[in-house]
Design a protein with these regions (language model features):
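Positively charged n-region of N-terminal signal peptides that target proteins for export
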Residues: 1-4
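Bacterial N-terminal signal peptides
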Residues: 6-14
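Intrinsically disordered, low-complexity regions enriched in small/polar residues
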Residues: 8, 27, 37, 65, ...
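Sec/Tat signal peptide C-region and signal peptidase I cleavage site
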Residues: 15-20
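C-terminal partner/receptor-binding element of secreted or periplasmic proteins
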Residues: 21-47, 111-136
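Mature extracytoplasmic domains of secretory-pathway proteins
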Residues: 46-106
Length: 136
């Protein structure tokens, strides 16, 4: 019985480790040229943004991010990534929503803990999904 328990524990640990290794972060996504191109265009056309937001364009940028989450709107599955300023996540953060294959990206950003600003002209449904993901 003891061997069975040990074997089960080892299997669970291996599965958890494999699952964590398969999670995709923004740093992984932007290695795909389509994602990087969409994100670069979004930030370039957004006007004046805090300097930390440019860090999301780097595969080893100085920001904090979490693994991808998904939202389906109108039958389309979007990828959601959040990123925040290192050491100040509560006040400076953004949520990014990528269309399939990185074809386009929209975002919501909060600067200095103030109101949300949407980038890329997301639809009302996309804004709702961005806001919901941001508040999690």
């Amino acid at each position: 019985m003891r061997r069975l328990c040990c074997a089960l524990i080892l299997m669970c640990a291996a599965c958890a480790s494999a699952a964590a290794a398969n999670q995709i972060y923004l740093t992984d996504a932007i290695k795909n040229p389509a994602y990087l191109r969409a994100l670069t265009g979004l930030l370039k056309n957004a006007g004046k943004l805090p300097s930390w937001t440019r860090q999301v364009l780097k595969t080893s940028g100085d920001y904090v991010g979490t693994p991808v989450a998904y939202s389906t709107i109108g039958g389309i599955r979007y990828e959601l990534f959040d990123a925040c300023k290192a050491h100040d996540c509560g006040n400076n953060a953004m949520e990014l929503m990528f269309a399939p294959h990185g074809a386009k990206v929209w975002a919501v950003i909060v600067q200095d803990g103030k109101s949300m600003t949407y980038l890329g002209s997301p639809s009302a449904a996309q804004q709702a999904a961005l806001k919901e993901a941001f508040q999690k």
